[in-house]
């Protein structure tokens, strides 16, 4: 019941207020990250007073907590620019920052250009599939359907291929607007790697990388940009880091895994994907997209994200302190943001890599 003297907003007004609230949440997340993290792109190497880093927007919400906790514990300031994985790799390669952050491992060409850089897994999360379909709260999607949408071959939400895997759901005859990252992005890498494992056509025609030539849709910069676009656009779909989905209140699709189950990007399912890692290669490159069917509850677009750091760095001591904090005490900040703790085998590999810097 409304309080005396108050009137209820009409339904259309309520929807407008709700949408504005979601957009405000996304903006506030961006502002919060910016106020703690953002530095000028191309900033000079950090002085002895602290560290600078740049890269992944996926890890940015967790990074904000790491930075705050590390500064309180050690008194060492850290600045971070959430500029995307591709830009982060470029900046650490140019040595304009002390560390890069990327959800995609270095390619052989990038590793060579970075000159003695080491990639260290330091966080574990997922790329979710956010959607804005009026009246639809729960949605199942398969890799084949997602490939069809981003190929531009599935264009309506009531397409039979979508309806078949969503029995009982009333799907509207609404045009689908696929949204993709316009900047170099680890989320793009993870999403397109999953599609490449599912669809031979996608693998041969598009492939996977931090930037690819999407066949359909509209581009948006950063996780905040793609989230905002999906929230504002009826019929839109986009691949978005799980923590941004939480902040925006967007619906997340349950995605089909190799066992044929449709799973959400929650902690339990991310951990199930990561549990398939039994060993870590020397270069620390780990892929957990579309894991084996034995991981029956795994979310299939889960990913590790990496710190990219050079050997014998000017700030070696501070870097080792910060990296060790991130992979140990810093993991406690993750659960509220849909970051799962590193599995023991990965944690061990990360500690070993840090010790060799």
Give names to the regions the model predicted.
Residues 1-3, 30:
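Short intrinsically disordered, low-complexity coil segments enriched in acidic
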Residues 30-40:
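Bacterial N-terminal signal peptides
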Residues 3-22:
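Short, Lys/Arg-enriched N-terminal segments with co-localized hydrophobic residues
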Residues 11-13, 34-36, 46-48:
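Short stretches within intrinsically disordered, low-complexity N-terminal or propeptide regions
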Residues 46-357:
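Flexible loop/hinge segments at secondary-structure junctions
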Residues 18-32:
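N-terminal export and membrane-targeting signals
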Residues 6, 24, 53-56:
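Intrinsically disordered/low-complexity terminal segments and short unstructured peptides
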């Amino acid at each position: 019941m409304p309080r005396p003297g108050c009137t209820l907003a009409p339904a259309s007004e309520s929807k407008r207020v709700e949408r504005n609230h979601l957009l405000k949440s996304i903006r506030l997340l961006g502002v919060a990250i910016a106020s703690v993290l953002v530095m000028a792109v191309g900033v000079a190497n950090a002085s002895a007073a602290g560290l600078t880093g740049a890269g992944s927007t996926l890890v940015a919400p967790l990074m904000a907590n790491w930075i705050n906790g590390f500064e309180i514990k050690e008194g060492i300031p850290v600045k971070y620019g959430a500029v995307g994985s591709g830009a982060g790799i470029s900046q650490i390669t140019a040595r304009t920052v002390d560390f890069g952050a990327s959800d995609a491992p270095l390619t052989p060409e990038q590793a060579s250009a970075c000159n003695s850089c080491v990639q260290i897994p330091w966080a574990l999360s997922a790329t979710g599939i956010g959607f804005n379909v009026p009246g639809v709260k729960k949605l199942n999607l398969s890799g084949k359907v997602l490939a069809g949408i981003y190929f531009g071959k599935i264009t309506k939400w009531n397409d039979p291929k979508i309806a078949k895997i969503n029995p009982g759901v009333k799907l509207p005859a609404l045009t689908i607007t696929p949204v993709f990252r316009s900047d170099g992005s680890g989320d793009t890498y993870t999403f397109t790697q999953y599609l490449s494992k599912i669809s031979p056509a996608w693998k041969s025609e598009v492939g996977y990388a931090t930037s690819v030539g999407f066949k359909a849709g509209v581009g948006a910069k950063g996780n905040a940009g793609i989230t905002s676009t999906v929230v504002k656009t009826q019929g839109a779909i986009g691949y978005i880091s799980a923590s941004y989905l939480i902040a925006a209140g967007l619906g997340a699709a349950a995605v089909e895994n190799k066992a044929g189950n449709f799973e959400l990007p929650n902690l339990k399912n991310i951990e199930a994907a990561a549990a398939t890692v039994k060993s870590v290669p020397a270069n620390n490159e780990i892929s957990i997209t579309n894991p084996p069917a034995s991981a029956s509850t795994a979310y299939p677009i889960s990913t590790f994200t990496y710190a990219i750091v050079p050997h014998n760095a000017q700030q070696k001591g501070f870097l080792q302190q910060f990296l060790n904090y991130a992979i140990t005490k810093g993991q406690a900040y993750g659960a509220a943001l849909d970051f799962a703790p590193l599995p023991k085998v990965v944690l061990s590999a990360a500690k070993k890599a840090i010790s060799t810097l």
